[in-house]
Amino acid sequence: MGKHYLPNLAHREEMLREIGFASIDELFSDVPEGMLKEFNLPGGKSEYEVFIELNETLSKNKTALEMPSFLGAGTYFHYIPAHVKYLIERSEFLTAYTPYQPEISQGMLQALFEYQSMMAELYGLPVVNSSMYDWGTSIAEAALMTVRLHRGKRKRFVIPKAISPEKKAVIETYTRGANLEIVEVPWDESGRLDIEKLKEAVEDSAGVYVEMANFFGLVEENVREIGEIAHEAGAYFVVGADPTMLGIFEAPGELGADIAVGEASYLGNPMNFGGPRAGVFAVRNDKKLIRQMPGRIIGMTRDAEGKRAFVMTLQTREQHIRRAKATSNICSNEALVAVASAIHLATLGPKGLRELGEVILKNTAYLKKRLSEVAEIPFEGLYFKDVPVKFKRPYGEIHEALLAKGIHGGYYIGKHFPELGETALFAATETTRKEWVHALIEALKEVA
């Protein structure tokens, strides 16, 4: 292992001579010595030695199959049919980057067209782009879009306080440069959006955003009414929805949404430590809205010979048109994630998606019922996936005690919402087993 393949020493010496330096140290002599550190890497190893070392390190991890996990709060453990991974790993789909001559990749464009078509049916809105980075990005882009639709005359965007801190951070980061004011509406005693406070906040706003199930997991019962309040104030109505709940709940379009957003990666994609993801972005059939959509839209047409062809119908990003006219600076989308979502959704079909939603709802209700035996559920109502649980002891201590018993507890939200005290979100999906819930409750009886 004594040879220098990288960096190539001969090439390095040649480059140094060309720019008039004798050594690398001389080249970086203006860097203060106190900031320099020794770069002491160990010697090289064989591939087998590296394999053994990495395997030993990775074996310390515990997957959601090996260790009962009740973590949720935006990242959930769903079952993915085996063929989804097989199909997206085919070379026709698994590419390094979005092609700059996309019409060459007819298979990829058709897959994205199918994704758009299925999401349009699912969200009840006819026009869907080929994905954003994630749910939070979709909300932020929707906020900017509502301002553009008002020609900059309205610069306020209303969101619920009971929203994921990560989504909120993305929204604030995205909109800061546009001088957009983000207005938060608190929850009422039921844990849902406070309608009276919304009526006060909506005045002169560009858009109003609400989620069909908020960060606490509570299903919002007044989505249609919230939309009516937004429209009466002249604001656009943006609805966020988890696609796995849309087999059993009304679609955002049916509830009056002008724009709908969501997280496509909940279908067909593993947790992956939180990413990559794919944001859903859909609008109603209004040319004014379609022209202001971010991202890219795949369309179906006929070529010069009359054959069916898939093309990028709209791609209003800054690399393709004048920057001042661009609707977004997103340079790529999450095409592979979107294709995986489309494959999973096509596998489920309407009946399978309904059954998936019913199982999640049933498992969430069972988890809530059992958790109420050992702790307080702050809000009553219908929950989907997440359930808030309030404890008397510091939750950090409880969480560590659960880990010691081989159980991953919920996500502590007291740090984001101090008014909720020692509260954590515990999540259930179709993968949650009753024996896991039983083990959790027995453990909590000891440590909580």
From Swiss-Prot:
Enzyme class of the recorded protein, top EC level: oxidoreductase
Gene Ontology annotations of biological process type: glycine decarboxylation via glycine cleavage system; nucleoside metabolic process
Molecular function as annotated in GO: glycine dehydrogenase (decarboxylating) activity
Annotated keywords: Oxidoreductase
Position of the signal peptide: none
InterPro entries, sorted: GcvPA, GDC-P_N, GDC_P, PyrdxlP-dep_Trfase, PyrdxlP-dep_Trfase_major, PyrdxlP-dep_Trfase_small
Record-linked CDD domains: GDC-P
Catalytic activity, EC: 1.4.4.2
Keyword match Oxidoreductase: yes
Similarity comment text for this entry: Belongs to the GcvP family. N-terminal subunit subfamily.
Subunit structure: The glycine cleavage system is composed of four proteins: P, T, L and H. In this organism, the P 'protein' is a heterodimer of two subunits.
Entry function: The glycine cleavage system catalyzes the degradation of glycine. The P protein binds the alpha-amino group of glycine through its pyridoxal phosphate cofactor; CO(2) is released and the remaining methylamine moiety is then transferred to the lipoamide cofactor of the H protein.
Protein name: Probable glycine dehydrogenase (decarboxylating) subunit 1
Organism: Thermococcus gammatolerans (strain DSM 15229 / JCM 11827 / EJ3)
Lineage, uppermost ranks: Archaea, Methanobacteriati, Methanobacteriota, Thermococci, Thermococcales
